[in-house]
Each structure stands twice: as structure tokens, then as C-alpha cells.
Curated annotation (Swiss-Prot):
The gene is fruK. It comes from the Bacteria. One of its GO terms (cellular component) is cytosol. It is an enzyme of class 2 (transferase). It holds the Pfam family PfkB. Keywords: ATP-binding, Kinase, Nucleotide-binding, Transferase. This is Putative 1-phosphofructokinase. Catalyzes the ATP-dependent phosphorylation of fructose-l-phosphate to fructose-l,6-bisphosphate. The active site is at D247 (proton acceptor). The keyword Flavoprotein does not apply. It comes from Mycoplasma pneumoniae (strain ATCC 29342 / M129 / Subtype 1). Its EC number is 2.7.1.56.
Length: 300
């Protein structure tokens, strides 16, 4: 059974250094450690959940990444990338963020085999194993194979157009796409769907045991193959950057489930923390004071 004693493992294929720049030069540039898995681990730690993040890092930017990560005291296991760790630029223009993402580093097959060997030696059947980010498809296939062989609690938040084919009938414990990703995955011929059509698509989606879908400023959906819950978003105090909001939603939701909260309670906390992330640069951390606000929810 999945519970607070379950170890959390996060495979973040290619972490990054996020460089926030103000287009109007009203504030200095800010460097933060980035990557979906890093963001998740930071917010999960706020609830006493300490994941281990596995990633690939390459010089000359590896050392800078590790220096930026040090204040968060995360458990990180890195494997060698042949080329440098990415630097992604987040250009801020009022409430708008333009992202200029560097190319994914080159990762040799030997390094992937080393990561797989580490997972096989450490992941237990009741552990939670999260794969997130963008993978080279060759490596994603291998990591999916090993993930499903090690634990029944596999969580996927990956950017892969052919994910359904790669799953090959295997059912993750949870998937977390955003609305656009979900619609493209199940209804590729028509990306323009209204809420009624979206609800029907969700209820027909049997690829995963649980679906957590973020819908931007509208809120989030959770479907467990029996009930479909919709939680309205909390309006952020201010719009600074949406970077990391989806990672926060997933990380906080999982952390609260591990602490034995029900899905409604877990999602309430998660949408509050996602809103707080939008109100600042990078994700919320231990320096932030989060006041939980009531939010509306209903079953569809």
C-alpha cells in the first residue's frame, strides 16, 4: 500500500538552470535550479516528504546547478551528461512569461544504463516512482520498462506525443497532463473542445488508474475511474510567472495523499500552493508563508 512510509523517487531526465530576466530591466536577473522533478521535490519537502531526484548533469554548468540547489538540501543522484546542463531563459514582461529553452543535453546509453541499475537496486514495490519532463524517446522506453517492473505506483508527467503507444497497454498509477497535452493525446484531430466535451474525454480515458489534469486559471480535475472531481483555481495574489505551477500542483497533491489526506483535501492544498507559485519567481519554498483559502469544488 502507498503511504507515508513509501519512498518517493523522481526521474528528471534533464534538469536546468532557470534564468529569469525582466524585459524592462526593473529588477536584476535571477538564477534558480529548475526542472520539473526539482520543482516537485522542493514543494514535497515542505510537507516532510523527502524524494530522491535522479537526473543527468553535464559540465561546465553542472557545478553552478549544484551550487544553486544546495540551499534546498535535496537528495540528488546525478549521472553524467556528455554536454552541458541546460540554461533556460524566462523573459518576464508584466504578467507574461516567454520561455526560451536550451536543447536537452546529450546523454549516452551507458549513463542511462547506470541510472537503470541504480533504480533496480533501490526502488521497492511500494515506492512511488515519478518520471517527468522531456525524454529522448529511446531512453523513455527503457525507463518505462524498468519503472513498471519495479513498482505499481508509477506516475507520469512527461512531454511525449506518442506516450499512449509507448505505454503499450500498461497502466500508470497516475498521469498528470495539462489540458492541452491531454486533449492532444486523446483527441489529436480536434484541439478545440468545450468543457462538456472535455469531461466526456476524461471519463472515457482508461489508460491510467488516476488522472490529475491542470487547467490553468480554471482549476484542476482529478479522475479515479469512478468519480470526476473539479477544483476551482485560487486567484493568485499577483501574476509573476506560471513556471512551475503544474509541478507544484502535482508535488503537493502527491505529498498530501502520502500523508493520508483524501483526494479532495489533497487537491485543495495543491491548488493553493500552485497559486502561490504563480505569485513569485520559481516554486514556493520554506521561506514562503502560505495561507490556505477555501475553494469551490464539485463532481461532474
Amino acid at each position: 500500500m502507498l503511504n507515508h512510509n513509501s519512498k518517493v523517487w523522481i526521474v528528471n531526465y534533464a534538469c536546468a538552470i532557470d534564468y529569469y530576466l525582466d524585459k524592462h530591466k526593473q529588477q536584476r536577473g535571477v538564477l534558480t535550479p529548475g526542472g520539473k522533478g526539482i520543482n516537485m521535490a522542493i514543494v514535497m519537502a515542505l510537507f516532510g516528504i523527502k524524494p530522491t531526484v535522479l537526473t543527468f548533469l553535464g559540465q561546465p554548468t553542472k557545478d553552478l546547478f549544484l551550487q544553486l540547489l544546495k540551499p534546498y538540501q535535496l537528495d540528488l543522484v546525478s549521472f553524467p551528461a556528455t554536454t552541458q546542463t541546460r540554461i533556460n531563459v524566462k523573459l518576464l514582461d508584466g504578467a507574461q512569461t516567454t520561455e526560451i529553452n536550451d536543447v536537452t543535453p546529450l546523454i549516452e546509453e551507458q549513463a542511462v544504463h547506470e541510472m537503470i541499475a541504480y533504480l533496480k537496486a533501490n526502488v521497492k514495490p511500494n515506492d512511488l516512482l515519478v518520471l517527468n519532463g522531456r525524454f529522448l524517446q529511446r531512453d523513455l522506453v527503457k525507463l518505462l520498462d524498468v519503472a513498471f517492473s519495479l513498482t505499481k505506483y508509477v506516475v507520469l508527467d512527461v512531454d511525449e506525443p506518442q506516450l499512449l503507444q509507448l505505454l503499450n497497454q500498461r497502466q500508470p498509477w497516475l498521469m498528470k497532463p495539462n489540458r492541452d497535452e491531454f486533449v492532444a493525446m486523446v483527441n489529436a484531430n480536434n484541439s478545440n473542445v468545450d468543457q462538456q466535451e472535455l469531461v466526456q474525454l476524461i471519463k472515457q480515458f482508461q489508460t491510467t488508474q488516476n488522472l490529475l489534469m491542470s487547467d490553468g486559471a480554471q482549476g484542476a480535475y482529478f479522475f479515479d475511474q469512478q468519480q470526476l472531481l473539479f477544483m476551482e483555481a485560487i486567484p493568485p495574489q499577483q501574476l509573476v510567472s506560471t513556471t512551475g505551477a503544474g509541478d507544484t500542483l502535482l508535488g503537493v497533491f502527491l505529498a498530501n495523499l502520502l500523508l493520508d489526506k483524501d483526494p479532495v483535501g489533497s487537491l485543495k492544498v495543491a491548488v493553493n500552493y500552485a497559486s502561490a507559485t504563480i505569485s513569485k519567481l520559481a516554486v514556493v519554498n520554506s521561506n514562503d508563508q502560505i495561507v490556505l483559502k477555501a475553494t469551490n469544488y464539485y463532481y461532474l
